Amino acid sequence: MSEKVCVIIGASHAGVSLALQLRKEGWEGLIELIGEEKELPYHRPPLSKEHLSGDKGLDAMRLRPEKIYQDNSINLRTGRSVESIDRDGKKVTMDNGESLAYDKLALCTGAQVRKLSIGGQQDLIFYIRTANDVANLMKQLEAGKKVVVIGGGYIGLEAAAVLSKNKLDVTV
């Protein structure tokens, strides 16, 4: 009998927590943890505060050190996305064409940013969901520039506060 395989799609908080909990609960099979971002998994809440302000780097935001994945025999596949799921054949195919067979499959993909249909210069419209999003936004920030934040939830207001503190003219 071949070794059991659990494929987890989504290497953020839910996916990492599931992978570690599987080991804690005694799962002895393979664990394949697939994440789109190239970085090790990190906490997202600081993106719109400490990371945007430059007070906290990505290394300080890691969910777990890289060694934890190795120590728990979790095959962390960063920079990969799943293109298709064959439920009948019990396999997933990634963007690089590689297929992984599974016995158990968990979808831990989280939310996606809702892109707005706004005219104008699309290269000047930014969203905050990933560390890369924040890095791209930070490249455009200069004191005195005008910024419009669309969204008055936690992330929008936190980002607005940080941008305002950094001498940008912010409208929410």
Locate the predicted segments by residue:
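FAD-binding core/adjacent interface of flavoenzyme oxidoreductases
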Residues: 1-9, 62-150, 165-171
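Beta1-alpha1 glycine-rich phosphate/pyrophosphate-binding loop at the start
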Residues: 2-75, 162-172
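Glycine-rich nucleophile elbow surrounding the catalytic serine of serine-hydrolase chemistry
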Residues: 16, 154-157
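Catalytic cores of transferase enzymes with a strong primary signal for eukaryotic protein kinases
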Residues: 29, 126-129, 158
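Proline- and acidic/polar-enriched loop/turn elements at helix boundaries
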Residues: 31-34, 81, 118, 154
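Glycine/Thr-rich phosphate-binding loops of Rossmann-like dinucleotide-binding domains
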Residues: 41, 102, 115-116, 157-159
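Short secondary-structure capping/turn micro-motifs that flank functional sites
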Residues: 85-86, 156-158
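Hydrophobic alpha-helical segments that mediate membrane insertion or helix-helix packing
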Residues: 153, 160-163
